[in-house]
Each structure stands twice: as structure tokens, then as C-alpha cells.
């Protein structure tokens, strides 16, 4: 028993010692882990502090670059501690405070354009000027971009171990672009592209390339005539396919029998080439051979078409420098597609002819007269001249009416047809007849049977009425007053089209009136009430309120002229020298005369 207890106690002691050693090791490892964690935490905090310090330094540099009088050496040193994002912030902040975005430039920004793109007529290119608007000149824009491209893109807190770049600054005298170029066309069209458009098919025939490739046949290799501008001494000739060469050989065998007739066509073409000169004698000498040849080849329509085509091509393109080149149908279609836009632009430029100033002036006055006549109503005349507007309008319009009547009588008397004996006999015959012919349609006569039945019915009704047996049916008549109608309310101002049109007219007049009233030292408030009341009497439609600014200026002049008596302002009277000079100067700028303005104002002096 004692022997058994001894080993057990020894084993317990060994286990206890092992457990104590494990606990001690665990404490040591935990202590080491805590030390590592604290060390890593300290390193992380140091890295964060370093990062924050470099960022703070970069922001401080950005603030310093917003000031004036920046030297080149300071700018080179600043490039080592900032990123391109920091530099773009410098450019934006300087433009906000109306300074040039380039730190070395001390100029102030002037009027900044609002548009995003600019078309350069010097280089024929389109530029995006979003960034260019932050600089005072193209040189500053290019110099800023040149310096920004050298700034490293790596973070500022890891540049201690890197080698700092040697910054270079753009020297004066080197102009830059107007902005970022917009690529409207990937590649310019060349003459070689017309004959070999294979590499362009991906851009223009992406959807239909498969169908065209499947349906391509020998017809694509058939050659058609096409005109290319300019001479082509070094132009590449279109490469012929083997099938087209075989066709050409076969066509030569078939057309050998027509060589004699084609020879006459060649002779005629040579004679036409001689007729290109402006000498009239040579032209007359060529007329007789042409007539003979036309009679010879009248039997062959194909040769006649060739002759006509050659004549048209020789005569039409003799003055211009063009070259007749044979290209395939596929190339011809590609040629048309390439130059479709240019042809449209040239066609629109040639069609826009300059209109004669007199014609433009007449059209302007005609349109304004029609507008003012449509605007004028009886309420307008009553507002201008009072209740007795009829007498005032008749006096002012009596003389032109008499002239028109006299002109009509003279025209009637001077009509040559009225003196013809045939017309006189017809007029006398019409006067002798008890009735005259009318232009109305004549109704067809009723049938005899219907008339007979109606007569018998009428006689029967008369006899029955006198005997007292006939009773008339009471006709139920409904008065128009008894008809019930649903009451309708007038439209409110926000939905009334007439009110909206009046508001539009007043807005247009308010835009042009300050420019007219300013030189006369009259405020808009002096005439606005009367002008508004006058506009409310007009008959406005959706068509007679659409005018150009120059037309609205003339309309405002006319309305000011007719409101002179109503307003009672002496500055608007014709006796005022200042008003007269102002009107004369304004009409000269509009290429009009006082008579033209008078012809517009007289519309409101005549009755409706």
C-alpha cells in the first residue's frame, strides 16, 4: 500500500510543476502580445500623425499659392509637397478670387465667358474651355498644364524615400491651345479613302456590314463615272478585280462590231473640245458636224446617251479644275456618304442669297401694317379719340378715299372692253329684258302629277273649312326663350388666351421701351398705364404677336406716337427738337424714313 502511494504523490507533484510552468509561459506570451500590440499601435499613430502633418503642410502650401507675387523657386519647391489634386484646387481657388489660375501670373481675370465650348476660326477646331476660363491667356493655361504634368501622383507622406523631380517651367513666348480639343472627326478624308473605303466600313456600316458582305457580287466591281475636285497627278488608281478584268475582255469582243459608230462619237467629242473656246466663229463651225452626227446615231440609243453625257460633262466642267475618274459603285456610295454634310452646308450657303434692302424694308412695313390693322378695333379708336371717333377718323381718311374713288372711275372709263360694240349691245339687251340673268342655280321643275295632287288637296281643305267641318291641327311652337341652357362662366386670367397674349405683348414692349424713353428722359411709369389700357383694346391672335426685336421697336414707336395726345407729355410732341432728332437718328439706324413711320401711324387714324 505504501509502495502504491509513493508513485501517486510523485505524479501529482510533476503535474503541478508542469501546470505552474504553463501558467508562467502564458503570462509571458500575453505580456509579449501586449507589447507588440502597443508597439504596433504606436507605429500606426505615428504614421497617421505623419500623414496628417504632410496633408496639413500641403494645405498650407495651397493657401500660400493663392497669394500674389509667387516666385519661380517657391513654386518649384511647392511641387515636391503637393499632388495634382492640390494644384487643381489652387487653380480653382485663384479663379474664384478673380486671379489667373497660374500662380506665377499676377493678372486679374476679366469677363469670363459663359459657354462651355469655343470654335476657333484660326485652327478650324472646337475646344472645351471649362479649364481655360480659369486663366487670363493661352500661355498661362499651357504653362499651368506643363507644370501640373510634372507633379508626382504618389501620396505626399511616402515621398521621403523618393527622389524629388527637377521641375521645369515654361518660358515666355510659347503660346498654348485655346482649351481641350474636341475630336469631331477621327481622321480627315483623303483621296485614297474614296477608292479604298474598306477600313472605313466599321464606322459607317456596323449594322449592315454582314448583309452587304453576303450580297456582294460582281456588280460592285462595275465602274461608274464620278467627279473629284482638283487634279490628281499622284492619286492611286482603283484596283480592278480579276472578274472585272475578265468582263472587260469579254466586253471588248462583243463591242468590236460597234467600233465604227463609236469612232464617230470620239470625233464629235473632239469637235466639242474645240468648241470650248469663246470664239463665236468656231462654235458656228462646229454646229454642222454635230447635226450630221446626230442624224447618224439616232438609231442607236446607247450611243446617243454616251454623246449627251460627254457633252454635258465637257461643257459643265470645262471651267472648273476637275478630273474624271472611274470608281466602283461601292466607292461612289461611300463618296456620297462621306461628303453628304459638306454638300448640305455648301448648298445652304449658295441658296442663302442676299436680299435687297428695299425688298426687306417693304416686307417689314407690309408685315407691320397687317399686324396693326389686325390689332385695331373700335374700342381702340374710342380709347384714342373718345366717343366721337367716327368724325375724327372720317376727316383724316376722307382724302385718300376720294383719290381711290377717282382712280376707280378713271380705271372704269379707261377700260377698253367697255367701248366694244358687242358689250354695248349686250348691255342694252339686258336693260330691255324684264329680268336679268342670275348666277344662282335654277331648281328643277316639279312634276305635273305632284302639282295636280297638291291642287286637289288645297281645294278640299278650302271647301271643308268653309263648311265648318275641317279642324286645323294645333301646331306646338316652342319659344326660343323657353330653351334651357347651361350657364357658362368666363375664363380666369391665368387660363384666358387673350389675357396671356396681352401679357406677352406688354413684356415685349417693356424690353424695348427703356431704350426709347431713356434719351427722352421719360420713365416707363409715366406711360405704362395708358399703354396697358391701349393694349387691352387690341384684337390679338396667336399669329400677330410674333415679331422680331426690330419690329417690336417700330411698334413701340408707333404706339408712342399715337399716345402723344392722350399722355399730354410735351417731350413726345413733334414740336420738341430733342424728340425730332431722336426719332430721325433712330429711323436712320433702322434704315427707315419719317414717311414710313407716318404710314404706320395713319392706320390708327382711319375707321374700322
UniProtKB/Swiss-Prot annotation:
Compositionally biased region (Low complexity): 206-218
Locations listed in the record: Cytoplasm; Nucleus
Record PTM N-acetylalanine, positions in chain: 2
Main localization (coarse): cytoplasm
Ranges where the record places region Disordered: 1-38, 193-262, 403-423
Alphabetical list of PANTHER family matching this protein: RNA POLYMERASE II SUBUNIT B1 CTD PHOSPHATASE RPAP2-RELATED
Biased composition (Polar residues): 26-36
Residue ranges, compositional bias (Acidic residues): 405-414
Official protein name in the record: Putative RNA polymerase II subunit B1 CTD phosphatase RPAP2
Subunit composition and interactions: Associates with the RNA polymerase II complex. Interacts with transcribing RNA polymerase II phosphorylated on 'Ser-7' on CTD.
Annotated GO biological process: PERK-mediated unfolded protein response; snRNA transcription
Zinc fingers (RTR1-type), renumbered ranges: 77-160
Top EC class of this enzyme: hydrolase
Modified residues (Phosphoserine): 9, 216, 432, 479
Amino acid at each position: 500500500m505504501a509502495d502504491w502511494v509513493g508513485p501517486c504523490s510523485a505524479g501529482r507533484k510533476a503535474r503541478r510543476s508542469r501546470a505552474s510552468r504553463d501558467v508562467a509561459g502564458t503570462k509571458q506570451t500575453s505580456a509579449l502580445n501586449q507589447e507588440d500590440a502597443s508597439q504596433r499601435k504606436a507605429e500606426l499613430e505615428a504614421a497617421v500623425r505623419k500623414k496628417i502633418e504632410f496633408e496639413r503642410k500641403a494645405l498650407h502650401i495651397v493657401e500660400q499659392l493663392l497669394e500674389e507675387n509667387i516666385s519661380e523657386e517657391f513654386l518649384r519647391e511647392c511641387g515636391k509637397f503637393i499632388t495634382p489634386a492640390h494644384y487643381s484646387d489652387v487653380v480653382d481657388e485663384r479663379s474664384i478670387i478673380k486671379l489667373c489660375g497660374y500662380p506665377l501670373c499676377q493678372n486679374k481675370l476679366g469677363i469670363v465667358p459663359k459657354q462651355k465650348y469655343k470654335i476657333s476660326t484660326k485652327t478650324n477646331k472646337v475646344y472645351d474651355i471649362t479649364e481655360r476660363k480659369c486663366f487670363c491667356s493661352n500661355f498661362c493655361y499651357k504653362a499651368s498644364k506643363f507644370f501640373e504634368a510634372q507633379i508626382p501622383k504618389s501620396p505626399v507622406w511616402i515621398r521621403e524615400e523618393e527622389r524629388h523631380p527637377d521641375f521645369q517651367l515654361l518660358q515666355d513666348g510659347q503660346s498654348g491651345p485655346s482649351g481641350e480639343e474636341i475630336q469631331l472627326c477621327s481622321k480627315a478624308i483623303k483621296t485614297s479613302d474614296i477608292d479604298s473605303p474598306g477600313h472605313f466600313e466599321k464606322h459607317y456600316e456596323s449594322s449592315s456590314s454582314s448583309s452587304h458582305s453576303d450580297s456582294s457580287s460582281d456588280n460592285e466591281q462595275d465602274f461608274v463615272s464620278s467627279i473629284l475636285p482638283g487634279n490628281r497627278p499622284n492619286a492611286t488608281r482603283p484596283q480592278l478585280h480579276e472578274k472585272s478584268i475578265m468582263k472587260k475582255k469579254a466586253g471588248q469582243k462583243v463591242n468590236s462590231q460597234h467600233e465604227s459608230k463609236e469612232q464617230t462619237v470620239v470625233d464629235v467629242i473632239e469637235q466639242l473640245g474645240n468648241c470650248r473656246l469663246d470664239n463665236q466663229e468656231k462654235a458656228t463651225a462646229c454646229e454642222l458636224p454635230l447635226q450630221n452626227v446626230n442624224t447618224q446615231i439616232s438609231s442607236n440609243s446607247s450611243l446617243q446617251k454616251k454623246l449627251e453625257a460627254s457633252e454635258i460633262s465637257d461643257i459643265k466642267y470645262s471651267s472648273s479644275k476637275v478630273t474624271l475618274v472611274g470608281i466602283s459603285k461601292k466607292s461612289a456610295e461611300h463618296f456620297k456618304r462621306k461628303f453628304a454634310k459638306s454638300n448640305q452646308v455648301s448648298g445652304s450657303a449658295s441658296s442663302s442669297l442676299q436680299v435687297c434692302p428695299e425688298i426687306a424694308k417693304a416686307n417689314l412695313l407690309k408685315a407691320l401694317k397687317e399686324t396693326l390693322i389686325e390689332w385695331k378695333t373700335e374700342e381702340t379708336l374710342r380709347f384714342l379719340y373718345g366717343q366721337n371717333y367716327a368724325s375724327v377718323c372720317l376727316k383724316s381718311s376722307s382724302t385718300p378715299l376720294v383719290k381711290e374713288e377717282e382712280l376707280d372711275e378713271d380705271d372704269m372709263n379707261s377700260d377698253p372692253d367697255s367701248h366694244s360694240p358687242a358689250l354695248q349691245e349686250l348691255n342694252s339687251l339686258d336693260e330691255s329684258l324684264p329680268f336679268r340673268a342670275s348666277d344662282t342655280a335654277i331648281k328643277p321643275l316639279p312634276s305635273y302629277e305632284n302639282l295636280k295632287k297638291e291642287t286637289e288637296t288645297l281645294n278640299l281643305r278650302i271647301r271643308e273649312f268653309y263648311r265648318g267641318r275641317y279642324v286645323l291641327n294645333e301646331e306646338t311652337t316652342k319659344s326660343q326663350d323657353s330653351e334651357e341652357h347651361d350657364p357658362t362662366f368666363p375664363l380666369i386670367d391665368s387660363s384666358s388666351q387673350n389675357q396671356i397674349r396681352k401679357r406677352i405683348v406688354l413684356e415685349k414692349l417693356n424690353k424695348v421701351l427703356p431704350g426709347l424713353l431713356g434719351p427722352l428722359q421719360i420713365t416707363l411709369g409715366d406711360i405704362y398705364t395708358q399703354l396697358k389700357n391701349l393694349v387691352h383694346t387690341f384684337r390679338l391672335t396667336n399669329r400677330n404677336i410674333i415679331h422680331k426685336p426690330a419690329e417690336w421697336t417700330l411698334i413701340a414707336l408707333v404706339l408712342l406716337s399715337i399716345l402723344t395726345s392722350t399722355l399730354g407729355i410735351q417731350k413726345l410732341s413733334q414740336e420738341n427738337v430733342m424728340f425730332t432728332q431722336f426719332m430721325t437718328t433712330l429711323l436712320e439706324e433702322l434704315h427707315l424714313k419719317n414717311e414710313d413711320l407716318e404710314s404706320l401711324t395713319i392706320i390708327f387714324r382711319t375707321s374700322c
